[in-house]
């Protein structure tokens, strides 16, 4: 049984980062909405609890509250930002609207305490330990609860962190989970290992054996069907399930005509030939392109592609006898997004291709062997299972494929042009050592024509946009500052080698305000 940290989510945009940072310390954790039941918290049996930040103010009538049981379990508690304010207010302290709101970098001076012991960025001129942290708050604690002392402060926030060492309750007004807080990882490590006494028992080799055992116990002798896309998540799920139950797994690979260059061939070779997985190949490219005719709205394209996949998958599943389980490559961020904590207050940005597409009419039991794992853990698992590194570290690819990388209507001609351009882009990034320096890179087809000169002739051809970003969590991203010589080489190759393209542009938009994908 793993030591486990419970993270209660109050709607913070950084909540899943907290979970990732805890996992990085080799400790298992789960993120759940703040309003889970007391019974759930008891049965979870955490060795420590973290209260996330959130957008609410403690002064509103419907302000989220910390379940009282959190303070009664006798385990350490760490409140972050709003979590600290809620803890202070509920334990007898006071919170006020800050006269000076703090958003961004701040320097804090710390007092001796267990949480910050030997953790500092420097010693200031007065001999006090200083921390560089990331703040994001409009309210602040102005009176500590009984039993607490101040353990960090600056001129704007006299109680920037607080501690009740006896009960092992701590609060920090800053965000230790973001990389801008330079010692944040060390602070979280101190909390989970030294204060919560969690063991270093979350590691991939052990997880592989545990996961195989769980799959065998659940599935027994039943057959399992899985929609294999060639992406990282479904590929790792297929490899893990196959390791557990062998030929009881049947994969269905649907070629929708919207895949990357040679993706279908590479996927079939990896799984059918090299790993001896039973894979049914379905070429439905004409069917998908026919259904997409005349559709220009991105959301409608996503829904159409999803609907067609479900219909084809159902048809293939009906041909297989004695299938009792449907396997999916759902990973932990998918679970978090669909849990309904902070999502209740957020608007739809894009429909998620892994959520809501389950064909319920199949009446199959659901098997999601990766639902506990973050993306970096899925990649680590893939390597442990012997999958090729190029596949495991392949950049994310949207479920609708090139359908949402072609702006407007999807046509066969456009898919061919885009496939070639994207392949050149990725090949040159790999050759220059930039592929693994970027988190995601791809080409986008713009259905507009521009005037050019090819030799002595005027040309009027299509435009390709290139997009490459660097990010830790895909919640925010910076455009990758690729060398000009590399961009020039990519542009020259695309224009010279692909008839129909005469202009290449590079997207230098960050996220926010832009999303990573164009549609």
Curated annotation (Swiss-Prot):
Its EC number is 6.3.5.2. GO terms for cellular component: cytosol. Keywords: ATP-binding, Glutamine amidotransferase, GMP biosynthesis, Ligase, Nucleotide-binding, Purine biosynthesis. Pfam families: GATase, GMP_synt_C, NAD_synthase. It is an enzyme of class 6 (ligase). Residues 4-201 form the Glutamine amidotransferase type-1 domain. It catalyses: XMP + L-glutamine + ATP + H2O = GMP + L-glutamate + AMP + diphosphate + 2 H(+). InterPro entries: Class_I_gatase-like, GATASE, GMP_synth_C, GMP_synth_GATase, GMP_synthase, GMPS_ATP_PPase_dom, NAD/GMP_synthase, Rossmann-like_a/b/a_fold. Pathway: Purine metabolism; GMP biosynthesis; GMP from XMP (L-Gln route): step 1/1. It comes from the Bacteria. The active site is at residues 81, 175, 177. Residues 202-394 form the GMPS ATP-PPase domain. ATP binds at residues 229-235. One of its GO terms (molecular function) is GMP synthase activity. Homodimer. Catalyzes the synthesis of GMP from XMP. This is GMP synthase [glutamine-hydrolyzing].
